[in-house]
């Protein structure tokens, strides 16, 4: 996980959490209440070939936001917020009921401030929620970054359970991403070298097999982390650092997989996705395959004008202020890159 190497990046601790819901419809509950938000993807206008800030004032705020996941039916959204220079980080949740989205709140199993909860991922069939937490696996274990999973039964998420060996180890595991056949891709911290590498473990008869470290076309750059794999395993998006054609510190790269399990040379995903900003290390694709969501701390706001308490607070509490936000773009950007994949 990038925070293991990049947590020295300074993010401001917000003094005020302002979730001022931006209206996506003209209906309101009443004077002083939050606007009713309805429609797919929180009623946001779909992006084309240019990236857009996602859900300004609802999900993307002045805080640090990252790690977007949505269920296949489009009715549940998970994402992360952090504060206090990563002292506190947890998973937020919004659900659409009777056509109306709830205001994002902390997910019910991610409320203990003693632990971190991050990097949610929904399985392609929508029955499992994977995420990372520093919760101890049991009373005899020490707190450590492990992969946890909740199972959905009768419309309710179960309490999380530790995924266990062989995927989880005494070291640290990050950023789970699962294919249709249950294969899990994730980042593992090598306790000897101190480097992070992308691994995968196949699911056979309901049991995860011995993890496999992927080759150099996936484990690229001087550092890499937080890889997202397509549900059909046809491509993988890898945030990589130290690449010669990088726009900034860490950029999103993509590698495509052929029928013989070969991975193509990694390709920078271009200015449509990457920027000179350093905070770009969490990407995912919606379960309908239409949209790429990604984290970026690019600045999008102009000067706050004449500096005052009011203007600085407004700037501080607004998205695109230098803290990471969530953006989205059509996956046509991926298909264009696929055409020129080199193995």
Q: Across the structure, where does each feature detected by a protein language model lie?
A:
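N-terminal secretory signal peptides that target proteins for export/translocation
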Residues: 1-7
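Sec-dependent signal peptide recognition
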Residues: 7-14
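C-terminal or otherwise distal, non-catalytic regulatory regions appended to signaling enzyme catalytic cores
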Residues: 8, 27-28
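Short, linear, compositionally biased motifs with a strong N-terminal bias
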Residues: 15-19
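C-terminal motif of bacterial Sec signal peptides marking the signal peptidase cleavage site
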Residues: 21-23
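Short, conserved micro-motifs composed of acidic
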Residues: 28-343
């Amino acid at each position: 996980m990038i925070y293991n190497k990049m947590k020295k990046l300074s993010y401001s601790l917000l003094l005020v959490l302002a979730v001022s819901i931006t209206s996506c419809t003209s209906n309101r509950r009443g004077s002083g209440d939050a606007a009713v938000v309805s429609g797919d993807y929180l009623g946001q206008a779909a992006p084309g070939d240019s990236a857009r800030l996602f859900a300004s004032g609802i999900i993307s705020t002045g805080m640090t936001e990252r790690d977007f996941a949505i269920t296949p039916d489009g009715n549940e959204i998970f994402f992360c917020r952090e504060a206090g220079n990563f002292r506190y980080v947890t998973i937020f949740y919004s659900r659409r009921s009777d056509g109306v989205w709830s205001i994002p709140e902390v997910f019910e199993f991610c409320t203990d401030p003693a632990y971190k909860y991050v990097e949610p991922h929904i399985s392609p069939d929508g029955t499992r929620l994977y995420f990372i937490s520093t919760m101890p696996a049991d009373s005899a274990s020490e707190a450590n970054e492990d992969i946890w999973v909740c199972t959905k039964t009768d419309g309710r998420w179960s309490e999380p359970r530790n995924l266990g060996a062989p995927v989880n180890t005494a070291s640290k595991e990050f950023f789970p991403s699962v294919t249709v056949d249950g294969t899990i891709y994730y980042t593992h911290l090598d306790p000897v070298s101190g480097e992070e590498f992308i691994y995968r473990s196949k699911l056979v008869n309901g049991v995860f097999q011995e993890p496999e470290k992927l080759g150099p076309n996936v484990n690229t750059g001087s550092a890499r982390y937080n890889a997202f794999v397509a549900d059909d395993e046809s491509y993988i998006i890898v945030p990589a650092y130290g690449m010669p054609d990088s726009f900034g510190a860490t950029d999103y790269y993509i590698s495509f997989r052929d029928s013989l399990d070969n991975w193509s040379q990694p390709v920078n995903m271009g200015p449509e996705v990457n920027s000179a900003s350093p905070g770009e290390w969490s990407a995912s694709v919606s379960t309908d395959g239409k949209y790429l969501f990604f984290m970026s701390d690019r600045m999008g706001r102009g000067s706050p004008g004449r500096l005052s308490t009011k203007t600085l607070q407004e700037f501080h509490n607004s998205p695109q202020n230098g803290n990471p936000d969530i953006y989205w773009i059509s996956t046509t950007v991926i298909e264009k890159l696929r055409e020129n994949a080199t193995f």
